[in-house]
Every structure is written in structure tokens, then in C-alpha cells.
Curated annotation (Swiss-Prot):
Protein name according to UniProt: Protein-export protein SecB
Single GO term (MF): unfolded protein binding
Source superkingdom: Bacteria
Coiled coil start-end: none
Compartment(s): Cytoplasm
Pfam families recorded: SecB
Family in the record: Belongs to the SecB family.
GO cellular component: cytoplasm
Length: 174
């Protein structure tokens, strides 16, 4: 049996762009290349929703999950902040089965894998484009984030013993 993530919605939950040292920073940029630090965090929460089964007339508890991809980028030139960009981009997902009854028979670890690896991989291109647009609209060259390997990020945290608590549905990469 195979499973897939079904995207129900995606949206910007929080977006902040600060350009605290303009216009001086643009003069500094003409003489030096900024140092850019980026951090990435993925988290998920369960959103239980009651649904009516039209065929049997019964109520079922169907789980939706909100996955948040948070990216923080800070650029500095000679210890002066050029810009700070912070975004929390979310998606609401459900897990679908190819079985006729759509019964989900996944372990907790398999669900975490889908939510912390597959889901952020779906969200990342949108975050990347939003950050590039925000930086270029603020007078800087567009910041094109490198592709993030969410599988490796997740596996590294498992090796370090982080996120092994059943209630911890997050992954960090700094």
C-alpha cells in the first residue's frame, strides 16, 4: 500500500524583512561582499477535524497536519546588518492511502517522516521564491537559497538523538 501527502492549503504565516542600515549599507555593499547566515527549521502539528462520512452517515476523526517551514536569513557586511529576512511558510496536509477504504496504517515514525521530509520539500520552492523576491524588492541582489536536503537534515537529527520524543515534530538546520 502506498501513501501520499495531499496539500489542502499553503500560506505565509509570518514574513518580516528588515533593512535597518539603509541607505549606507548599499555603499558598503559596493566595497565588500555580505556574509549571509541562514537557518532552517521544520515543525508540524496535528489538526484533528471531524468529518461526516456521506455514505454511512457517521462522523470520522480525520487528521490534518500543519507543517511550518521557517527560514531566517541575515546578511552582514563588516559586522553591520545589511538585512534580516524571516519567514514562516505553512502547508496544511492530509495523508492519503491508495486503498479503497483510505485507511491509514502508518507508524508514528512514518508519519513524522512524511511531515518533516516530504512536506517541507513541497513547500521549499515557494519559500525560496518569496525570499528572492523580498531581497530584490529591498534593493539587494536576490537571495537564491541552495536546495535543502530535508531527508539528510532529518536523519542527522535522529542520529544526534534530537526529535526522538514522540511529541517532538521538528527539525533544525543551522
Amino acid at each position: 500500500m502506498s501513501y501520499k501527502l495531499d496539500v489542502k492549503a499553503q500560506y505565509i504565516k509570518d514574513l518580516s524583512f528588515e533593512n535597518p542600515n539603509s541607505p549606507q549599507i548599499f555603499v558598503m555593499m559596493s566595497k565588500a561582499t555580505p556574509e549571509i547566515n541562514i537557518s532552517v527549521n521544520v515543525s508540524s502539528i496535528s489538526l484533528p477535524v471531524k468529518t461526516d462520512d456521506q455514505k454511512s452517515g457517521t462522523e470520522n476523526l480525520s487528521s490534518l497536519y500543519e507543517v511550518t517551514l521557517q527560514v531566517n536569513a541575515e546578511a552582514r557586511i563588516q559586522n553591520t546588518v545589511a538585512f534580516i529576512c524571516e519567514i514562516k511558510y505553512c502547508g496544511v496536509f492530509s495523508i492519503k492511502s491508495d486503498a479503497e477504504n483510505n485507511e491509514i496504517d502508518l507508524s508514528h515514525q512514518e508519519v513524522k517522516d512524511m511531515l518533516l521530509v516530504a512536506a517541507p520539500s513541497i513547500l521549499f520552492p515557494f519559500v525560496r521564491e518569496l525570499i528572492a523576491r523580498a531581497t530584490s524588492s529591498s534593493g539587494f541582489p536576490p537571495l537564491m537559497l541552495d536546495i535543502v536536503d530535508f531527508r539528510t537534515m532529518y536523519e542527522n537529527q535522529l542520529k544526534q538523538g534530537v526529535g526522538q520524543n514522540d511529541n517532538d515534530n521538528s527539525v533544525d538546520n543551522v
